Amino acid sequence: MLSSFFLTQHLEAGTDEAGRGCLAGPVTAAAVILPENFESKILNDSKQLSEKTREQLKPIIEALAISFSVTHLDPLIIDEINILNASLKAMQECVLQLNPTPLYIIADGNRPLLSKNSFKKCSGKIFTNREIEILQSIPSSSIIKGDSKYLSIAAASVLAKTYRDEYMNTIHEEFPMYNWKKNKGYPTKEHREAIRKYGVTKYHRMTFRLLPEQTVLDL
């Protein structure tokens, strides 16, 4: 069973991202503050849950959370500052959107979420000095496999995954030949064959190796 809290029982937020390894679409992050009495026998790392279970959990998390937020960062930003920095920035933006501001943050992963070097500038997504001050004033811990250890991170994992899946289902209608409704932008054989046949779209990440034999995709 997942633990409720890491250090404190008051306003501790969990945050996680989805879509880091995809060839197309945004990286999506979520942050969640759960109440002390939140319980769930089925909540776990979103990767361990079926799509049906994730969809069942989404409205429950949204209804019972003290606060939650979701952020998408598009491929242009991913290409500009790289996927690691984009993932951190998406989680940072989610933390800023929480109301009330959490007293502690736990993030899935092994990289410091709020270190001085993590606030990468990029086009259209520059934190103000005040926002950076707010983020740096909140103590945080990054926890490897945190989404399978703590309820708040698992809840964030579910929201990030379900919101990103909805986004990919929407853009699938614009470019159905890539079958994003099924592969969600991940590097499946089918997705790469579609890239080879039809080329790339505005939703593809140009700094990723979109085709295995290419170091840089020919445009």
From Swiss-Prot:
Location in or out of the cell: Cytoplasm
Keyword set, alphabetical order: Cytoplasm, Endonuclease, Hydrolase, Manganese, Metal-binding, Nuclease
InterPro entries: RNase_HII, RNase_HII/HIII, RNase_HII/HIII_dom, RNaseH-like_sf, RNaseH_sf
The RNase H type-2 domain, residue ranges: 10-219
Catalytic activity: Endonucleolytic cleavage to 5'-phosphomonoester
Record: residues binding a divalent metal cation: 16-17, 108
A Pfam family it matches: RNase_HII
Cofactor section: Mn(2+); Mg(2+)
Primary enzyme class: hydrolase
Keyword Hydrolase: yes
One GO CC term on file: ribonuclease H2 complex
UniProt GO BP: DNA replication, removal of RNA primer; mismatch repair
Presence of the UniProt keyword Acetylation in the record: no
EC number: 3.1.26.4
Gene Ontology MF annotations: manganese ion binding; RNA binding; RNA-DNA hybrid ribonuclease activity
Principal cellular location given in the protein's record: cytoplasm
Cofactor note text: Manganese or magnesium. Binds 1 divalent metal ion per monomer in the absence of substrate. May bind a second metal ion after substrate binding.
Primary role: Endonuclease that specifically degrades the RNA of RNA-DNA hybrids.
Family, similarity comment: Belongs to the RNase HII family.
Protein name (record): Ribonuclease HII
Species name: Flavobacterium psychrophilum (strain ATCC 49511 / DSM 21280 / CIP 103535 / JIP02/86)
